Regions:
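Glycine-rich phosphate-binding loops of nucleotide-dependent enzymes
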Residues: 1-101
Length: 101
């Protein structure tokens, strides 16, 4: 039986066997050990360096700030802001995530 982190790695590896150019990851590191998170982060970095686009969905702001080139913030299913890496702060993300449209 595989641990949760190893299960995540296997799932990502299966996706990589496909010839897709966009990978959508929804909370890919939730509930796994720090070491395994680091392994997944390194894998994602390698994939993006090779030209794969990754949509990374996470509720952990530090994770988003460290992993993303751009963050799209939503509230109740609507986009409230798009931030480039230079604009990332936890305060700005929180402000946009609670913004009413």
């Amino acid at each position: 039986r595989l641990s949760g982190g190893n299960q995540q790695k296997v799932i990502i590896s299966r996706w990589l066997l496909a010839t897709e150019k966009i990978l959508i990851l929804d909370e890919p590191t939730r509930g796994i050990y720090v070491k395994t998170k680091a392994d997944i982060y390194h894998l994602i970095d390698r994939l993006t360096a090779e030209g794969l686009s990754v949509i990374f969905i996470s509720s952990e702001m530090p994770e988003l700030i460290n992993m993303c080139d751009r963050i799209v913030v939503m509230n109740h299913g609507r986009t409230t802001g798009v931030l480039s890496r230079e604009e990332f702060t936890q305060e700005r993300i929180m402000e946009l995530s609670t913004k009413e449209l």
